[in-house]
């Protein structure tokens, strides 16, 4: 077994576990919204990012602002970085899907309606506006992860509720919400609308995660 294969397998497993952490955090948030405790839910959502940071898991929005875009010799590796991020994103989505399937095992539809409301709200915004708002989430994510890597995890408890209350979409949280929504939601909206919306959130998060690099001439 080659080292490249082992690294890819480890990365994918890590990204799946990261998606599971985000999915469980999203589940808690939906449950709190269901009970009228949205503020508590926003704080509990921090569990996902705290898990990712402390276990050094691969999360798309926790990696996009730090992945090397250039090699040590200064040559461009942008497209390779994008492939790495999409690989991580795929694993994250798989993890979110596993939790969404588990959520459907409940006897009561706890959080299903709340997930539907979030999905319909994103669709009402449209892909361009939702994608633009996702930039804010990416910026917050890179900021709080930077603080956490410096031994200041308290920033996570502020940053996560902040992007939730600002209405900034997080592409992995949204992936969980969409898969947790009632199946009938997908009969009333064209799947194409969702497939157009989601990449805009991913791109918006990527731009936001890299705002520090975009606006600063100095390389990492």
Question: Model segments located where?
Answer:
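Alpha-helical transmembrane segments and their helix-helix packing motifs
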Residues: 1-220
